[in-house]
Amino acid sequence: MKVKLLVLLCTFTATYADTICIGYHANNSTDTVDTVLEKNVTVTHSVNLLEDSHNGKLCLLKGIAPLQLGNCSVAGWILGNPECELLISKESWSYIVETPNPENGTCYPGYFADYEELREQLSSVSSFERFEIFPKESSWPNHTVTGVSASCSHNGKSSFYRNLLWLTGKNGLYPNLSKSYANNKEKEVLVLWGVHHPPNIGDQRALYHTENAYVSVVSSHYSRRFTPEIAKRPKVRNQEGRINYYWTLLEPGDTIIFEANGNLIAPRYAFALSRGFGSGIITSNAPMDECDAKCQTPQGAINSSLPFQNVHPVTIGECPKYVRSAKLRMVTGLRNIPSIQSRGLFGAIAGFIEGGWTGMVDGWYGYHHQNEQGSGYAADQKSTQNAINGITNKVNSVIEKMNTQFTAVGKEFNKLERRMENLNKKVDDGFLDIWTYNAELLVLLENERTLDFHDSNVKNLYEKVKSQLKNNAKEIGNGCFEFYHKCNNECMESVKNGTYDYPKYSEESKLNREKIDGVKLESMGVYQILAIYSTVASSLVLLVSLGAISFWMCSNGSLQCRICI
């Protein structure tokens, strides 16, 4: 009976001992992050750093409407193609939108010199002042200024560019001309002109009354002399002749001088440019909408404060940096490994092995206790708040450092610059690869550090409890301690807040340790007696059985027994 009581006492003591466990928060989150060492780690909380959505629309940029060129190209707009007349009144914009294949460009066929460079210059312009550099009615009294072409027709009638004048002879003469303009606008002025190349000498004589014409354009930074190239050419837009188009930027205070004795397509209007950060030219078929955004891409507007995006590499406005990543998620919480609910006396005793507690909702790290007054969860607010502050500051710092928002417009190359374009693409691809690698590596490293940081915090909390309890409790694994004394709610609270009174409970703990050790020793002695008794009994049964078998075999002659004296 004594043995049975001791065994029951031991079982009762182990089952109903007061217990406290250290663990961490868990929830039903399915967020996954990658670290340097692991992929798809499920975590309780994380933040997305990569924007992958857009609205599919063209929007105002900070309240300013874009300049939609519609069916016109940049060339058609800036030269004043008659079909682009509606664009003449537009003098300010947030960005410029050109469709992929606009119909109305240079209506009179010819070569547009340095067109890609002009587009690049205009991509940084947010407004201009269109003014008459050489008034039509007063600048050319000795020349005809009404030159038109069927290839530039408007409303079924022959017409010409609105920003240029086609000068021809007057009264059978084409006097030498010399005209200058001094830039007093205190801004760069864009000046455009053209040189006509007739298809035959007859047209040359009829229009300009000379066979040896020239055009000279000179400023402080530009000097060029043009000679018409008279030659038969294939018809383009029903024209065998050509007009080559040229432009220059005139600095404030500089003067440009035009001299010619024929073939000049003279400037009528010029443009005083106002540069603006965040402007640009994009090629897009996206529809315009009544929306406002800070970032515009050819695919649609992005409204995001995230540091990275994978929508499009060409952006206008304050935009996240483009990377080729499919996922950039930074952990802000802990590993999310909910404990097995059916295990342990508490239903979910977690810690360093089992997993986190879904019952603890007010913090990241904390305690679960069990005593005669019940059980419950409590977060350690100080360590949780310190961790939250540290991680929040880190995430904000990462976003701030990587969130260099800017405009990234595409570079323009003409058909003769394919090698340069291919080289540029390789360079851009290299930069994109570097940015993508840096972004991904940064997130991987920070995720690894954050998860290690949480593990360290839980272990520190465990060591804090262990150093208080000393030998007043024993470690039972999974981050739990079993008290050798009764620990009510007040006692539990003192352990949690670091004011546990070790001497107060040491005597009770010592007595209970000795009782438990005594129970173990007596139980061991009983088990030894039982083992000896069982061995002796088994041996006796074996000897009796062997004797009975021998006696039976001797009686029927199967076994002969001889006893010699």
From Swiss-Prot:
Function: Binds to sialic acid-containing receptors on the cell surface, bringing about the attachment of the virus particle to the cell. This attachment induces virion internalization either through clathrin-dependent endocytosis or through clathrin- and caveolin-independent pathway. Plays a major role in the determination of host range restriction and virulence. Class I viral fusion protein. Responsible for penetration of the virus into the cell cytoplasm by mediating the fusion of the membrane of the endocytosed virus particle with the endosomal membrane.
Quaternary data: Homotrimer of disulfide-linked HA1-HA2. Interacts with human CACNA1C.
TM ranges: 529-549
Extracellular side: 18-528
One GO BP annotation of this record: virion attachment to host cell
Tree of life domain: Viruses
Disulfide bonds: 21-480, 59-291, 72-84, 107-152, 295-319, 487-491
Subcellular location, record wording: Virion membrane; Host apical cell membrane
GO molecular function: host cell surface receptor binding
Note: Major glycoprotein, comprises over 80% of the envelope proteins present in virus particle.
Residue intervals on the Cytoplasmic side: 550-565
A Pfam family the protein falls into: Hemagglutinin
Keywords: Clathrin- and caveolin-independent endocytosis of virus by host, Clathrin-mediated endocytosis of virus by host, Disulfide bond, Fusion of virus membrane with host endosomal membrane, Fusion of virus membrane with host membrane, Glycoprotein, Hemagglutinin, Host cell membrane, Host membrane, Host-virus interaction, Lipoprotein, Membrane, Palmitate, Signal, Transmembrane, Transmembrane helix, Viral attachment to host cell, Viral envelope protein, Viral penetration into host cytoplasm, Virion, Virus endocytosis by host, Virus entry into host cell
Topological relation to the membrane, as annotated: Single-pass type I membrane protein
Lipidation (S-palmitoyl cysteine): 554, 561, 564
Protein known as: Hemagglutinin
Signal peptide start and end residues: 1-17
GO cellular component, as recorded: host cell plasma membrane; membrane; viral envelope; virion membrane
Family label: Belongs to the influenza viruses hemagglutinin family.
UniProt PTM comment: Palmitoylated.
Record-annotated site: Cleavage: 343-344
Record flagged with keyword Cytoplasm: no
Residues carrying sugar: 27-28, 40, 71, 104, 142, 176, 303, 497
HAMAP family: INFV_HEMA (MF_04072)
